[in-house]
Amino acid sequence: MLGLSATGVLVGGLWAWIAPPIHAVVAITRAGERVHEYLGSESQNFFIAPFMLLGLLSVLAVVASALMWQWREHRGPQMVAGLSIGLTTAAAIAAGVGALVVRLRYGALDFDTVPLSRGDHALTYVTQAPPVFFARRPLQIALTLMWPAGIASLVYALLAAGTARDDLGGYPAVDPSSNARTEALETPQAPVS
């Protein structure tokens, strides 16, 4: 779980580095009202940035579950539970680190307090930090944080379904065909005449 927490820091830092900011303009209308508008398709970054975080967390979930599957002697439900807890923690850390880094990089933006230029056209171009979550509702935040655990559980279940042995290949390996051979050797044979 500590390893997954450390990767959460890396994922949060990577997301903060590649997440696109939102560019906007703040202006005063002729009626004296302060307005703001996003430039071009910049408003799409409100969706793109959180989706990029989900993509990075999904990659982490697939890689982590595949690596954990290699740890043969501990395969089973306890590993899935630990993987789920670790990935949920990693997602929370990634979201926290990402939000902190973009906040430090772009600062907090309040459209009502942006200083405007003087002159005929009172306007200012601003850059807004990308959001970490799609919305600020608790359910959407919880689903975002639990997303990698669900992906990892799905990958782990597919790997378990593809295993031919009931013990998921754990150690010590028990080969049913070798048991049949030893039983056949121990069974007394009737003399052949």
From Swiss-Prot:
Q: Which GO terms describe its cellular component?
A: extracellular region; plasma membrane
Q: How does it sit in the membrane?
A: Multi-pass membrane protein
Q: Which UniProt keywords apply?
A: Cell membrane, Membrane, Transmembrane, Transmembrane helix
Report the principal subcellular site.
Answer: membrane
- Where found in the cell? Cell membrane
List the Pfam families.
Answer: DUF2567
Spans through the membrane: 8-28, 46-66, 82-102, 141-161
Q: Would you say which domain of life the source belongs to?
A: Bacteria
Q: Which family does it belong to?
A: To M.leprae ML1222.
Which protein are we looking at?
Answer: Uncharacterized protein Rv1591
Q: Which organism is it from?
A: Mycobacterium tuberculosis (strain ATCC 25618 / H37Rv)
Q: What is the lineage of its organism?
A: Bacteria, Bacillati, Actinomycetota, Actinomycetes, Mycobacteriales
